[in-house]
Curated annotation (Swiss-Prot):
It catalyses: uridine(747) in 23S rRNA + S-adenosyl-L-methionine = 5-methyluridine(747) in 23S rRNA + S-adenosyl-L-homocysteine + H(+). Keywords: 4Fe-4S, Iron, Iron-sulfur, Metal-binding, Methyltransferase, rRNA processing, S-adenosyl-L-methionine, Transferase. PROSITE patterns: SAM_MT_RNA_M5U, TRMA_1, TRMA_2. It holds the Pfam family tRNA_U5-meth_tr. The lineage of its organism: Bacteria, Pseudomonadati, Pseudomonadota, Gammaproteobacteria, Alteromonadales. Its EC number is 2.1.1.189. It comes from Shewanella halifaxensis (strain HAW-EB4). This is 23S rRNA (uracil(747)-C(5))-methyltransferase RlmC. GO terms for molecular function: 4 iron, 4 sulfur cluster binding; iron ion binding; rRNA (uridine-C5-)-methyltransferase activity. The active site is at 336 (nucleophile).
Length: 378
């Protein structure tokens, strides 16, 4: 993939952009193989990867420049602001909308937040795209409430031009710190969630809920998880760090009981909506800390299968110990950090590594997703 920003050393996020996708994936596979070399892996599945461009469904744009000439993008290594509205990771329609949002900020006259001077209002514009319908969730991250009226003044024209923008919100982030969002979220549209669908599972996205950024690979990841779990025919499932429920909802059946645990209340709201839409009645999604939940359960609550999809820090020693004690017949671990994955696998006692498969969720970078099936020792 060609990128002028990379050639000019303005943006270095896609550090492996000059390598063909198969070469990138081979290098990632080698890293994973080395990290898991201490484990006896019964089956290495072929890695899964997708297109090199137009795949990303979320843009996190720093708002730079001035009110009369705003720039949505990043600060270069040399300190210059550069627009990334034409980033090839985004679909063409998303690039076009990002350019229109630069114009929107100028028309609204909202001063970008200046970190050095601690002045200005608009910090970030966050844009999420639903691949099923090409609809959008748009968020403005502001320092205060001062500029909300300016956004509301220009919003009707924007929505008339882009009716596919279904959800618009303002997030208030008042502190002078490198924090993406604050606690307060104000909706400027009647709709408060974006509809999405992976495979046959309806999913919903709210402003603060985590969602995978590569829909094509995420759908394949969820489908693979479904197939692996189906082989076990579980009656009870736990989905820890469940987010909006993608893994659990793919793996549950109308006969099985699913418990989903996630710290984000917004994500749990979305998961409940999905379960209702699917007609699943033996489902319990709850906003709790996953480690605390597991530690508070009794042995009689032991599930047949536990699914974990933690953040980059992994599940940690305490949860590893809890899972080892519960001894479900299988643990399905989806990881975005192979280093913490290897550490956790070494901590979980009494299991063998049945299957491992790499999913290249983050092309042109060193990052990737890994799906691992652990089976209880006989």
């Amino acid at each position: 993939m060609k990128c002028a920003h990379f050639v000019q050393q303005q943006c270095l996020s896609c550090r492996h952009i000059n390598q063909p996708m198969p070469v990138q994936v081979a290098a990632k596979s080698q890293v994973l193989s080395q990290l898991l070399s201490g484990f006896e892996v019964e089956q290495w599945r072929e890695p899964v990867f997708g297109p090199e461009s137009g795949f990303r469904n979320k843009a996190k744009m720093v708002v730079l420049g001035a009110a009369h000439q705003p720039i949505l993008g990043i600060v270069t290594p040399t300190g210059e602001p550069v627009s990334l509205c034409d980033c090839n990771l985004y679909p063409i329609d998303m690039q076009q909308l990002l350019h229109r949002l630069e114009l929107f900020v100028r028309q609204a006259g909202i001063p970008p937040y200046n970190v050095d001077k601690v002045k200005g209002e608009l910090k970030f514009i966050l844009l999420t795209r639903s691949q099923i319908k090409g609809e959008y969730l748009l968020r403005f991250v502001l320092r205060s409430h001062k500029s909300i009226e300016r956004i509301e003044r220009e919003l009707p024209q924007l929505l008339s031009e882009y009716p596919q923008i279904k959800v618009v919100s303002v997030n208030i982030q008042p502190v002078h710190m490198a924090i993406l969002e604050g606690e307060e979220e104000l909706f400027l549209t009647e709709e408060t969630r974006l509809s999405e669908q992976f495979n046959d599972v309806p999913l919903f996205i709210r402003p603060k809920s985590f969602f995978q950024t590569h829909p094509e690979i995420a759908a394949k990841l969820y489908q693979t998880a479904r197939e692996w779990v189906a082989e076990l025919k579980p009656d009870t499932l736990w989905d820890l760090f469940c987010g909006v429920g993608g893994f659990g909802l793919h793996c549950a059946s109308k006969q099985s009981a699913l418990t989903g645990i996630e710290i984000s209340a917004e994500a749990i709201t979305c998961a409940k909506l999905s379960a209702e839409a699917m007609g699943l009645t033996q489902v319990n999604f709850t906003a709790l800390d996953s480690t605390g939940f597991a530690q508070g359960c009794d042995a009689k609550d032991k599930p047949d299968v536990v699914i974990v999809n933690p953040p980059r820090r992994g599940i940690g020693e305490s949860l590893c110990q809890s899972l080892s004690a519960f001894a479900p017949k299988a643990i399905l671990y989806s990881s975005c950090n192979p280093h913490t994955l290897a550490k956790d696998l070494a901590c979980i006692q009494g299991y063998r590594v049945q299957k491992v498969q790499l999913f290249d969720m983050f092309p042109h970078t060193d990052h990737f997703e890994v799906l691992v099936m652990l089976l209880k020792d006989a």
